[in-house]
Amino acid sequence: MSKYKVSVIIPVYGVEKYIGKCLDSLVNQTLKDIEIIVVNDGTKDNSQKIIDKYAKKYKNIKALIKENGGQGSARNYGLEHATGEYIGYVDGDDYVEYDMYEKLYNKAKENDLDVVICGNYNVSEDYKNKTTDLEFTKFDDNFINALLGKKAVWNKIYKRNIIGKTTFRSKVWYEDFDFSIKVLTNAKKIDYVNEPLYDYLIREGSTMNNSNVDRNLEILLAFDEIIKNKKYDKYREIIEFLAIDHIYISTIVRIIKANVSKDKKKEVIDKLINYMNNNFPNYEKNKYINSLSKNRKIIYNLIKNKKYKTIKLIFKIKKG
């Protein structure tokens, strides 16, 4: 018998400005039977002092400290200590709506679900602007929706036994993507509470804004593993679309926007396109391309025609 209904795991590194707001949103959840596992991943700031204050006041907070190993490693460590029936993840610079875990847990228990997914707010760093970002639900099959939708782990709860021995890769950018594909393809029952319940803070210091352009190639490791998986043939067309969406569009756009030389950009983009051609030679005929948003279809076609300067200009105008 699980001790708690939900265990929420929060990796902490360099978030002393934000961790108090994050913990406030968790200790005040309307679902009271919740375990809060805070993992200090060797942070050098004052986050631990803030965590200790909360841990003294709230008995359901489990404060753990480990050597720095990256966000994935911290999540794995937290999971080892979790006792909840369901598992959730929150990033230390984000926060959640006060009824998030009650709504997700109640939905899970209604139909004995393996995974429950919600929408989120995108929040500006000064907290002044919030925009709603609902989940992808274009298809009647929630399994397809989940695989084609957001690969973040923070807008979901997972039944503990569906995670099993699945772990996050350590010190890679795409740990959420890798973990999500593995767990979602193990799930039998998935559903949605499609309202914004998670508050995702968009800040310049976030991991994926790093200018080290070569690290974008780490996503290919995740796809290598997916292709080797015995379930690949069953989900081939979906995986191919994910490669279009994540390798061909998102990653190439990130490189185009990066502050590196033109030659370096070309080198990395060529590697990504070669990977697509070698592993998904018929990707241009994928039926799910039609499910791309209007803006992403435009970007897709610009990349196909190598109009990289136009893409950079679009994002420059959008930013400013």
What are these regions (language model features)?
Residues M1-V27:
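N-proximal low-complexity "stem/linker" segments adjacent to membrane-targeting elements
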Residues K3-V6, V27-V38, N46, Y58-K62:
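Short loop->beta transition adjacent to catalytic acidic/histidine clusters or analogous donor-positioning motifs
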Residues S25, N40-K49, D91:
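A conserved acidic beta->alpha catalytic loop
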Residues K66-A82:
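Glycine-rich, basic loop-to-helix element that forms the pyrophosphate-binding segment
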Residues Q71-G72, G92-Y192, L201-D214:
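Donor-binding/catalytic cores of nucleotide-activated saccharide
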Residues I87:
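Short aromatic/hydrophobic "clamp" motif used to bind/position activated sugar donors
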Residues L197-R203, N210-Y235, I249-S250, R254, ...:
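Catalytic core of nucleotide-sugar-dependent glycosyltransferases
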Residues V260-G320:
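Membrane-interface aromatic/basic loop that binds lipid-linked glycans or pyrophosphate carriers
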